[in-house]
Amino acid sequence: YKLEKSICKCETIEIGAVMLDEQLREISEFKRIIKPKYCTKIYPKYEKMTGITTAMTMEGEAFESAFHSFAQWCLDKGGEIQIIAWSGNDLSQLAREIYLKRVELSQEEKILMDGWRDFQKEFDHMLDKEYQISLDLALIYADVAFVGHRHDAVWDSRNTAELLRRTREEEDRTRIVHRAKSLFTTDPLAVSLEELFNFSCLVPQC
């Protein structure tokens, strides 16, 4: 238990997503609050950041149940489906917890995970950036205002979906590249906090 707890320094406390059709229109959403297995208290600053309190996680689902529900939600629509996320951090986090908590995956779930698409990496490549761009900064480059609560899984997904729509056409991508170049600065004081720190892994207090 001590070894597992030391490995799992952060646990997933929420799984959230929106589903898009072929025209990139939102047709469904998924949200589950997860009860951590090893950590029982969330730092107040993370409660404020995410809107998820310790009390909420204590009423949440086990990770295994929530993950299987998410996978089933994805697969129930039938046909081809691909998970698109802002950065590969979510995939790495899920993979670590699946391994640590010994979650058995079906063949369909394995295929679903293998098809994960890192949209942040694509966006960085589009702008020819060697560093990772935050979702907030990417939206600024696309001239899109963030809608909803930041660090809420569903709202982050919804804003990622909007960014995906804004980069669908070559003309739109070219416009974003030009805007990014006009806004880019080498002044380190102008870099956003999310460029300096990775908030994707929220550490509950153990």
Positions of PLM-derived features:
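Active-site catalytic microenvironments for nucleophilic, acid-base chemistry
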Residues: 97-101, 141, 166-170
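Alpha-helical transmembrane segments that form the membrane-embedded catalytic/substrate-binding core
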Residues: 153-163
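A contiguous pocket-lining binding segment that forms or flanks enzyme active sites
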Residues: 113-122
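Substrate-recognition/cap helix-loop segment adjacent to the acidic, metal-dependent catalytic center
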Residues: 89-114
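Conserved non-catalytic scaffold segment of RNase H-like nuclease domains
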Residues: 1-92
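Acidic two-metal-ion nuclease catalytic site recognized across multiple nuclease folds
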Residues: 161-206
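Active-site-proximal helix-loop-helix substrate-binding element of RNase H-like nuclease domains
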Residues: 41, 47-50, 54-57, 121-155
